[in-house]
Amino acid sequence: MLATESPSPVVEVRDHRGRSYRVGECPEDLIGCSRTWMLAFAWIAMACIGVLQYGFGVALTALHVTGGGNLTGALWVLALWVVFQAGAAAPTAVLSHRFALSPSRAVPAGAALCAAGPLTVALTDDFMLAVLGYSVLSGIGAGVVYATCTATVAKWYPEKRAARVGLVTGAIGCGAVPFIALFATILTPDNRTAVFLAVGVVMLVVVAQAGALLQNPPEGWWPQHIDPRQWAIDKTLNRSLSNNVTPIRQYSPSEAVRTPAFLVMYLIMVVAAAASLLTVVYVPILAIHQGFSLALAAVAVGLLAVVNGTGRSIAGRLSDRLGRRQTLTAALLVQGCAQLGLVYSASGALPVAFAGFAALSGLAGGAFYPLIASLVADYFGEPSAARNFGAVYSAKLFGGLVGIGLPALVVASQHLPLAFLVASAVSVMAAVLTRLLHRPGLPVVGLPR
């Protein structure tokens, strides 16, 4: 009689810090396929919503060049979109934790809300309706998709969190590129309705379908080919331990928000997001104001978006080797220098340099999102990482108001270069703030008297 191979037993183990892991199940046993498919579905969903943020500036510039119109009101529509997108992240994480909101339900619901944005601006010129459809509904939908996809990937790749979260969040930039090219090539006031309707339908279908296929692993799941107890202490197995910290204990969101480290992360997120969003939205407008062509503006934003996307994954990998805080400091310094370079190349009518500095700004301007997400897990622990990062990520809403809303007030007066100079300075200030990041839970030791 032949013996049948029985599945590996599921066991719960604890590391030296008391964190528990569920070990013994492979993804094929749980969902019938490799976890790579969960990464792919999340990447596709994120890629399709990127146009809502990264394509807005080019679409607005293309319509303004071909038909004129008021830029200030339209820019505030996007600023408010960022407010609702960032504000939706923390509630989504809470709903997922407390009410077991599955990604296969959350992402399709978010897809329907996301599609309301382009569908609304396709069918109306009314400012209040645009705010309701694009800023509120589409913003909330994008926040739901972003928070859910990021958390799902982090749960499937607990041993590669930084790199995989960087990869999936980077899809937002990469996925916007075809839409940026489309807007720069054919978008005019005459075909606006048809173009935006098509964008909305594609977004609804693709994001909903990809999201419906997403599943979470069991709570505390860990890949069976790695011993989590060794992973927690062995620097040859887990190379990120050499230059990164591990949490003293596991912090709930209510505990994390009371620590100095949370406050510093929140301030860095506000400043970094404001500077990054300024570049994403205003690079095409700055290009046109300085006499460059719409084609050059689109190339600059396209490069920015691609490098922004790929740079997030690269930053995650580098942070494993060099340290999260050190990599974050470098990214913020590069962002500040790149924004200074944008002003120099724009005022000097240097188109190639302008596109290059836009790409460099994108590289740094996307890196801080996965880096801060990884720092949250390093400082406050893995079990509540999604909810804790959602709380930090909400700082982006203030970044949207500062980085998009305030410059909209001076866009008509041709003072955009001044806004970029201010952004450069505050990016450097944010880099200095990283020196104040310290792992919570350590005793305060003073000098002897």
Map each language-model feature to its residues.
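Extracytoplasmic gate region of multi-pass secondary transporters
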Residues: F56-L63, S254-S313
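Helix-to-loop junctions at the C-terminal end of transmembrane segments
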Residues: A88-L101, R312-G323, V411
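Hydrophobic core of transmembrane alpha-helices in multi-pass small-molecule transporters
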Residues: G117, L129-V144, V270, A353-A367
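Intracellular juxtamembrane helix-capping segments at the cytosolic ends
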Residues: G143-Y157, R164, A367-F380
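Helix-loop-helix hairpin linking two adjacent transmembrane segments in secondary transporters
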Residues: I172-H225
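A membrane-interface helix-boundary motif in multi-pass transporters
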Residues: T185-V201, L409-V426
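C-terminal transmembrane helical hairpin of 12-TM major facilitator-type secondary transporters
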Residues: Q290, L296, G302-N308, R312-I314, ...
